[in-house]
Amino acid sequence: MTPNIHHDKILILDFGAQYTQLIARRIREIGVYCEVWPWDHSPEEILSFGAKGIILSGGPESTTSPGAPAAPQHVFDSDLPILGICYGMQTMAVHLGGATEAADKREFGHASVQVIYPDTLFSGLSDHPSEFRLDVWMSHGDHVSRVPPGFTITAATDRIPIAAMSREDKRWYGVQFHPEVTHTLQGQALLRRFVVDICGCQMLWTAANIIEDQIAHVRERVGCDEVILGLSGGVDSSVVAALLQKAIGSQLTCVFVDTGLLRWGEGDQVMAMFAEHMGVNVVRINAASRYFDALQGVYDPEAKRKIIGNLFIQIFEEEASKRKQAKWLAQGTIYPDVIESAGSKTGKAHVIKSHHNVGGLPEQMTLGMVEPLRELFKDEVRRLGVALGLPHAMVYRHPFPGPGLGVRILGEVKPEYAELLAKADAIFIDELHQADLYDKVSQAFAVFLPVKSVGVVGDARAYEWVIALRAVETVDFMTAQWAPLPYDFLSTVSNRIINELRGVSRVVYDISGKPPATIEWE
């Protein structure tokens, strides 16, 4: 019998920190289910959620400002263990009768925390055992200047006298540093101490248990009905296909729209993996000509994204309408999509780019929704894919934008540009694999620049196209640094592209970070 993997869980109340989702991922890695909710969620829902502990996240606001987000009273009335992180510790202190103040200087980066009192949270944790010190990551302007009644100061730094505090009888804890980031060396151990030892959660959130749970859920939900899935070849839809094939077999039909804007040979790879190897019923629609016709004369990146997304919906609808027995639509929605969707309702989110096929299918479609990954982060989806038997190379492939090469060809999209770019990109990726560099960068790809540069072919001058190479290193894709690939490697890639592809005279390497640049060029 499958254990109830949602029984023991943690609730994270989000005050707007950039690291909040990272807290959730770290807790999931421990093996415990958790969810992220806005800090001002309704008291009734927070209490009925059934969490075994609550974490108050960091945030960008100042507790010294009027109207700053405050820790809700009902959280402290719940008798649950509470861990406040950074702003979460500060709002806990203010709410319970302590005080905060603005620091003379922001404390950002590496810091050394001296453990003054080894309470349950800190007991046995140290990076320098003889001194009871922890190497941590700080990111704050305010700090707690007076602990609330009943609290004990448990740690300090050279800059702030209260770096952590606790009230053991209530199981309330606060840390000014960020245990969720890898720079805090004992961070994962500290979170495990809170989640497992203090809150008493069992570690049931594993790939094997998640698969069993979702198979049972899908079977119960869809019964004997047919399910239709838009298969893109990306990680999310591929894992959904593998999971549903295991759950309902021939009841699943996948629609694979070959846009002509995919990576080199990707369409054939998708068919070989799912239709031939796994026995999935896949309908392949060769729609390249429709996409290139629709994109003719279109130069604006946002317009291209919308055309590509809308045409996908149109083609998918056409195919779905042929399948009268289909009662359910499966999608690869993942947990960050759910969090961002909820966050956008606050009005604080800003659209930087239109995202392809995220909640894009029309509401008038009468199909029920099946979203077996909606509780999972991307790293969990990848682990699920491996557990389901998908090749490691497919599951851990670099991200690829929904509009595909359509946003890696600057300006107008033409078939000859797409073919040239796909081949150049394949050469770049092939060389990364051969040099054992592919897994050392977070994302790498080629970009087609619609400008011609003079070159020499034989004894003649030629004006031919320019290809840009882009490789970045990042933890969360919110910020990124360009990857310092070796010069001899870049030379090899450049020589191969220019020599093997007719029509390219120059290759350049993008050394822009994010910010100010985005990872994709469009």
Swiss-Prot record:
Query: Which residues participate directly in catalysis?
Result: C86 (nucleophile), H178, E180
Q: What is its EC number?
A: 6.3.5.2
Give, as one word, the top-level EC class: ligase
- Which biological pathway? Purine metabolism; GMP biosynthesis; GMP from XMP (L-Gln route): step 1/1
* Example of a GO MF term: GMP synthase activity
The UniProt keyword set, sorted, is: ATP-binding, Glutamine amidotransferase, GMP biosynthesis, Ligase, Nucleotide-binding, Purine biosynthesis
- Cellular component per GO, a single term: cytosol
Annotated Glutamine amidotransferase type-1 domain residues: 9-204
Top-rank taxon of the source lineage equals: Bacteria
> In this protein, which residues make up the domain named GMPS ATP-PPase?
205-397
The record ties this protein, via InterPro entries, to:
Class_I_gatase-like, GATASE, GMP_synth_C, GMP_synth_GATase, GMP_synthase, GMPS_ATP_PPase_dom, NAD/GMP_synthase, Rossmann-like_a/b/a_fold
Where along this sequence does the record place binding of ATP?
S232, G233, G234, V235, D236, S237, S238
* Catalytic activity as recorded in UniProt: XMP + L-glutamine + ATP + H2O = GMP + L-glutamate + AMP + diphosphate + 2 H(+)
Q: Which PANTHER family match?
A: GMP SYNTHASE [GLUTAMINE-HYDROLYZING], GMP SYNTHASE-RELATED
Q: Which NCBIfam families match?
A: guaA_Cterm, guaA_Nterm, PRK00074.1
**What is annotated about its quaternary structure and interactions?**
Homodimer.
Function recorded in the entry: Catalyzes the synthesis of GMP from XMP.
- Tell me the protein's name: GMP synthase [glutamine-hydrolyzing]
> Which species is this record about?
Xylella fastidiosa (strain 9a5c)
